[in-house]
Amino acid sequence: MLDIKFLRTNFEEVKAKLQHRGEDLTDFGRFEELDTRRRELLVQTEELKSKRNEVSQQISVLKREKKDAEALILEMREVGEKVKDLDNELRTVEEDLERLMLSIPNIPHESAPVGETEDDNVVARTWGEVKEFNFEPKPHWDLATDLGILDFERAGKVTGSRFVFYKGAGARLERALISFMLDLHTDEHGYEEVLPPYMVNRASMTGTGQLPKFEEDAFRIESEDYFLIPTAEVPVTNMHRDEILNKEQLPIRYAAFSSCFRSEAGSAGRDTRGLIRQHQFNKVELVKFVKPEDSYEELEKLTNDAERVLQLLELPYRVMSMCTGDLGFTAAKKYDIEVWIPSYGTYREISSCSNFEAFQARRANIRFRREPNGKPEHVHTLNGSGLAIGRTVAAILENYQQEDGTIIIPEVLRPYMGGKTVIK
């Protein structure tokens, strides 16, 4: 959520920057109307309440003096009715303004490339050499099915499309990656490990920006009005909702493993095979709470931490600086890390690393004090995948495949795989 005072005094500037996102700003124009009416109603209500108090005191004086107060009593009733009507209108206007504020996306940072679609994203850097095969490489779903380590068909029978059973060495590889990533981020990168709930309430989804705009993308448990988490970002960020932190606590860095659940409502027909786009998948998420002046330095560090996973796995990748039209709803700046997938002949996203500045913190009311009695300020929040496990499995299977259909296990994972060197 944007700062309403900043929006009020910089309306045209904010509008111009939001236009770079390619957003429909039809409703945005209502801000000035609603904000002005709200302030008018507040003034009118306070004036009438003050008058009501004044008349009430006059009535008390007349009654003490045994004088007729009927005219003033009628006047006070009329004032009371007007106050009631204005309070009702004020409540409606404030609710409309709140809904509008929750629907306005974040302002892009000045360093985000201006553009409309993913075609306008900018390559920040690449790492590693794309492997040249002397045979026709297979897609990971064929490799895994032939090896008996992933079972899409039975998962489809048990649940439906976009689900999978991991079996044998496939399950072991998934578990190895989870442990490897958590060990790296906690032991070397300084994050504290968190194992979060997989269900959250509506306030949590609103705090991180999934609601109200993207409710159709979420799995909801209607009987409790809980949501299955689309990412560990949601519960971990909301750990500190409605809290005031001390500056000594910052930066706070969490690494959280969780399963994630997404309806993929807008992805019909895309990536229908394999692990790239599943309704349920595992991920290690990195979440930070930092002082505002440190957030862009911390974004670079967070992105480097996610990159380190791919470097140790020796998987070629590139880092994309996302343009203003491809930032998503909540980010002020975002990097996507894309890993090379041979069967696609291109790079595919395996991590998004974002700086939300105070956008989430304002929605979730997460603040800090620089001094013991100082005025609370909103923290800046950041998060990034470190990494998406299923897509990492897909990248390993495809990049490490051999002509005979076996898979070489990356050296860094072998201690987690019981010393095995090959999946066969």
Curated annotation (Swiss-Prot):
GO molecular function: any one?
Answer: serine-tRNA ligase activity
Q: What is this protein called?
A: Serine--tRNA ligase
Q: Where in the cell is it found?
A: Cytoplasm
The EC category is ligase
Gene3D superfamilies the UniProt entry points to:
Bira Bifunctional Protein, Domain 2, Serine-tRNA synthetase, tRNA binding domain
Q: Which organism is it from?
A: Bacillus cereus (strain ZK / E33L)
Keywords tagged on the record: Aminoacyl-tRNA synthetase, ATP-binding, Cytoplasm, Ligase, Nucleotide-binding, Protein biosynthesis
Biological process (GO), any one:
seryl-tRNA aminoacylation
Q: EC number(s) on record?
A: 6.1.1.11
The residues that the entry says bind ATP are: 262-264, 349-352
What the entry lists under HAMAP family is as follows: Ser_tRNA_synth_type1
Q: What is known of its domains?
A: Consists of two distinct domains, a catalytic core and a N-terminal extension that is involved in tRNA binding.
Q: How does it assemble?
A: Homodimer. The tRNA molecule binds across the dimer.
What gene, per UniProt, encodes this protein?
A: serS
**InterPro entries named among the record's database cross-references:** aa-tRNA-synt_IIb (IPR002314), aa-tRNA-synth_II (IPR006195), aa-tRNA-synth_II/BPL/LPL (IPR045864), Ser-tRNA-ligase_type_1 (IPR002317), Ser-tRNA-synth_1_N (IPR015866), SerRS_1_N_sf (IPR042103), SerRS_core (IPR033729), tRNA-bd_arm (IPR010978)
Recorded GO CC terms? cytoplasm
**Which reaction equations make up its catalytic activity?**
tRNA(Ser) + L-serine + ATP = L-seryl-tRNA(Ser) + AMP + diphosphate + H(+); tRNA(Sec) + L-serine + ATP = L-seryl-tRNA(Sec) + AMP + diphosphate + H(+)
Q: What does this protein do?
A: Catalyzes the attachment of serine to tRNA(Ser). Is also able to aminoacylate tRNA(Sec) with serine, to form the misacylated tRNA L-seryl-tRNA(Sec), which will be further converted into selenocysteinyl-tRNA(Sec).
Any idea which positions bind L-serine? 231-233, 285, 385
Q: Which residues form a coiled coil?
A: none
Q: In which pathway does it act?
A: Aminoacyl-tRNA biosynthesis; selenocysteinyl-tRNA(Sec) biosynthesis; L-seryl-tRNA(Sec) from L-serine and tRNA(Sec): step 1/1
Organism domain of life = Bacteria
Q: Which Pfam families match?
A: Seryl_tRNA_N, tRNA-synt_2b
Concerning its family, UniProt says: Belongs to the class-II aminoacyl-tRNA synthetase family. Type-1 seryl-tRNA synthetase subfamily.
